[in-house]
Amino acid sequence: MTTMTFRRRAKSFIMITCLLFGVVVQAQQHDDNQDLRAKLFSQVLSDYKDVRECLEQEEGGLRKAQEDMNVEEHDLNRDGVNEYEVELSGPCTCGMVNCSIYIYRKTGPGFESILDDASGFGVELLKTSTNGYRDLLVTARDTAATQGQMTYKFDGMQYREAKNMLVQLETGESKPASRRLQFKRGASEATVNGRVSIALPDTYLVGARAGQTMTIKLTAPRKTVRFLLMSPSTRSLVADNARDWTGVLAETGDYTIIIDSDARNSTYTMTVSIK
């Protein structure tokens, strides 16, 4: 055997060995990835029994749900170990656009949920951090003209919602998705002024007890400005296009007042009393 022939055979052997090694590595990575997906899927089903029961009734059942599951890896606390963003598709966890978003971190042999109350169509990692973990921005469809942008910050144990903004897509105008109406100490009445536009309402939360009497008076230069009042159980309490309302409350909790308009930049003044 000549030296040149030996070298050719040696190179061929090395190339074949490298190719076989690559195939083995890829197969191992695929197996590891499938094992990870199976464990994360099982964790979601264990944490959310209602989701499991719903998925079992869907066409294809749990097998199809696991196949369609999307998993993204993020190193949220920069420790070299990834956390996992998990999204399931289908009506059990999604609306028309928004889907439930879960984030897990590895803990011993299993996984621990660190974000479990988010819903939207994407997670963005912000440059800022809180308690060592990257802040998160979840974007969600609100209406055809608006979207919600929720900022989540880590409190040392879990991600908690820190800010919830409503954004008008055409104009870029934004405002808090809701605000709590504050009464001064000892006062039973509060007045607020604001400005609303098409698809960009003002939403107020008012805490009250069953048996109390609530009165709402709304004044505005434009007749297109009106309000909607909902009970803690989301039952509507006023007729359309209301400007004032008085009633005895049947529930204890947060009542929601939504002020909107069919015109742009509509100003208003609202007075709420609870006695």
Regions from the language model: what does each represent?
Residues T2-I14:
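Bacterial N-terminal signal peptides that target proteins for export
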Residues S12-G22:
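Bacterial N-terminal signal peptides
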Residues Q26-D50, L125-A177, S273-K275:
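Acidic, small-residue rich beta-repeat scaffolds with periodic aromatic anchors
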Residues E58-Q66, T191-L200, L237-V238:
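Extracellular beta-rich ligand/substrate-recognition surface
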Residues N77-S89, T130-A140:
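Acidic/hydrophobic-patterned starts of short beta strands in beta-sheet-rich repeat architectures
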Residues E173-T203, G211, K275:
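Non-catalytic extracellular/lumenal accessory regions of secreted precursors
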Residues V196-Y255, I259-D260:
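Acidic, Ser/Thr/Pro-rich low-complexity intrinsically disordered segments
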Residues A263-K275:
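Edge beta-strands of jelly-roll/beta-sandwich modules across compartments, strongly enriched
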